[in-house]
Amino acid sequence: AHILGIKDMSGLIKPMAAKKLIEALKNEISIPIHLHTHDTSGNGVATLMMAANAGVDIIDAAFNSMSGLTSQPALNSIVAAMDSTERETGIDPDGIQEISDYWAAVRPVYAGFESDMMTGSAEIYKYEMPGGQYSNLKSQVESFGLGHKFNDVKDMYKAVNEMLGDIVKVTPSSKAVGDMAIFMVQNELTPENIYEKAKDIDFPDSIVSYFEGMMGQPEGGFPEKLQKLVLHGKKPITCRPGELLPEEDFDGIKKLLVEKYGLEGTEKEALSYALYPKVFEDYLKSLDKEGNFRLMGSDIFFHGLSEGETCEVKIAEGKELVVRLSDVRDADDE
């Protein structure tokens, strides 16, 4: 091994725990230690500083304007706090402030995608939900018409995790837990009644895939009774899922993309298709039908032009279009 990475995707490691962990590891191994965490609890900066004082080699942090909550702890604040200490970073505070200011101006453009989480929440220690999932779960719950039961879904997330054996929750296993939690709230299921009420119910694809072994084998194995209920007699795999994949025909994919879509057949295009064939084909169809929206400013793409507003669209090197919305009228009969 060249490096030891500690991925705390839910931001569960507390400051003193980080100190103890890093000190213990430093006493046993000589390779660099890299700590990744999230700031959902509000303790992220303290956690990284304790880890730094214990000798961690690498930490992940985010520019202040993009930090906190389900993101990473605040880089600018850490740099300032470590100034004039043994672990001084050497990072120019003015330089990173300039970059942070840039992202502070960009962020409002994407405000529609922000979670409505306004403050850190120590309840993350209760639910153990990854940062990225925590920020997306509410909109997912609302899409099922269960927004008024969001707290019930969070409680069920914890219950499902315990039903599965307190598993490592990171994509895709965290999605399986979340989907199962929503499914159980939807169908008024509980850990106690699920074996009777869900005998003939089709479970979410993600939880079926989990119990099939397609996400790997969890430490301690699967809970057999629940596995049998979910799979309805289907036999799970016991090997590494990747061993069952057929050899990918990349030359064939490149030929398809060239002949069907007129692409260059680059390695990047072939990999995109191999990983997400439907998503990539839908993207190509969108380009063909609607054009390349990447040429348009994000604010215009999301919100459109206001009357009298002008935007510039660079469609090629040295070729720029100026678009102005003069006015908006009701459509006529034709």
Give short role names for the model-derived ranges.
Residues 1-33, 49-56:
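Alpha/beta enzyme core
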Residues 6, 34-38, 61-62, 90-101, ...:
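Beta-strand segments within the central parallel beta-sheet cores of soluble alpha/beta enzyme folds
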Residues 7-11, 36-42, 64, 122:
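Active-site beta-loop-alpha junctions enriched in small/polar residues
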Residues 8, 54-71:
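Glycine-rich phosphate-binding active-site loops on the catalytic face of alpha/beta enzymes
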Residues 22-30, 79, 83, 104:
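Surface-exposed amphipathic alpha-helices with a cationic face
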Residues 39-51, 58-62, 76:
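Thiamine diphosphate
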Residues 46, 71, 80, 89-146, ...:
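Core active-site phosphate/anionic-ligand binding loop and the adjoining beta-turn-alpha structural block
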Residues 118-121, 128, 132-334:
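Terminal or standalone catalytic/regulatory effector modules within metabolic enzymes
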